[in-house]
Regions:
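Short acidic amphipathic segments
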Residues: 31-40, 108
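Short, non-transmembrane amphipathic alpha-helical segments
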Residues: 87-106
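Short edge beta-strands and adjacent turn/loop segments
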Residues: 40, 44-79, 118-122
């Protein structure tokens, strides 16, 4: 992995670079396909942490971050779920869908997805950015 937060796949002399922002985009778009997820849940310190973690090879967006570990990529997702859904099943489905989408689109096999449920929302509550 290069120092600028990209995955590098060497094919003899050819190289393919995948930026962390692409991994975040794929994971974020996958969230919208799963019923029961209300929104990403940004934490109050996300912006402060972003500046610090970026210097150490980590990339994040409020509510989601990517960390490069020795043998795998770790994705932490902080969400608000809709009331009435089985939270364990919802989390497992989100983990599975993100892993499968990253495998299909980016050929990433070694991905750990941690889901953090930060709140429950009634279905009629609007999506508020930053809450």
């Amino acid at each position: 992995m290069s120092s600028d937060n990209q995955l590098n796949y060497g094919l003899d002399t050819d190289t393919i670079d995948i930026a962390d922002s692409v991994i975040i985009d794929v994971a974020t778009k996958t969230l919208g396909t799963i019923p029961g997820i209300h929104s990403l849940s940004p934490r109050f310190y996300d912006e402060l942490v972003e500046g610090i973690t970026h210097a150490f090879g980590q990339r994040s967006l409020p509510g989601i971050n990517v960390k490069h570990r020795k043998d795998f990529i770790e994705i932490n997702i902080y969400i608000k779920a809709l009331y009435g859904y089985n939270l364990i099943e919802l989390s497992k489905q989100l983990q599975s869908e993100i892993k499968q989408t990253l495998k299909n689109m980016l050929d990433l096999d070694h991905v750990k997805v941690d889901v953090h449920i930060e709140g429950i929302v009634k279905e009629k509550e609007p999506v508020l950015h930053g809450n």
